[in-house]
Amino acid sequence: IVRVMHEAPPQDIRSVLDELEHEYRKRSRGFVLEKVAGGYQFRTLQTIQPWISEMKQSRPPSRLSRASLETLSIIAYNQPIARSQIEQIRGVESAGTLKHLIDRELITVVGRKDVPGRPLLYGTSRRFLEVFGLNDLASLPPLPDVEPIAENSE
C-alpha cells in the first residue's frame, strides 16, 4: 500500500489500516485485517475455520516433518545460526532438512559466520512469519524453562 500511495506519509497509512482493522472486527464478517510479519493480511475468522478446513481437504496436506519443525524452531530461536550449530543441537546431520526449509521459503541464508571456512548462517524468512501468523520474531512464544527437567533427571 505504501508503494502505491507513495505520496501519503506511512504513519497516515498505518492509521487508516488500524481503523480498517477495528471496523472489520466490529462488524460480523468472515474475515479480519491483522498485523502479520510487519505488514497486514486479511485472514478468516477462527469461527469459520472448520468450513475452510473442509474445503481445503480436496488438496493433499503439505505438512512439515518432525525433523523440519525441530530444525525450524532451532533456527527461529537462535538465528543467525550455522548448520554445524544446528547439527550440534539436534545430534544429527541436517543438510537435507535445511534444503527442504529453503525450498519451502521458510528460512533463508542471512550471511556467513566470521570463522575459518565462513559457513552460511540461516534465519527465518518473512514467509515463516506469515505461515505461523506472527507479526515479528518477538511474537514467538517463550521457550519453556528446561532447568527443572534437567534437575529431575539426575
Can you say where each PLM-predicted feature lies in the sequence?
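A short acidic, leucine-rich amphipathic alpha-helix
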Residues: 1-3, 82-89, 101
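A short, conserved structural fragment
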Residues: 21-34, 105-114
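Phosphate-centric recognition/catalysis
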Residues: 130-154
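Short, conserved catalytic or interaction motifs in soluble domains
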Residues: 77, 91, 112
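Short amphipathic alpha-helical interaction segments
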Residues: 8-19, 89-106, 116-119
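Short, cationic-aromatic polyanion-contact patches
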Residues: 35-52, 112-134
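Short alpha-helical segments that sit at the start of domains
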Residues: 43-69, 103
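Short amphipathic alpha-helical interface segments
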Residues: 61-80, 85
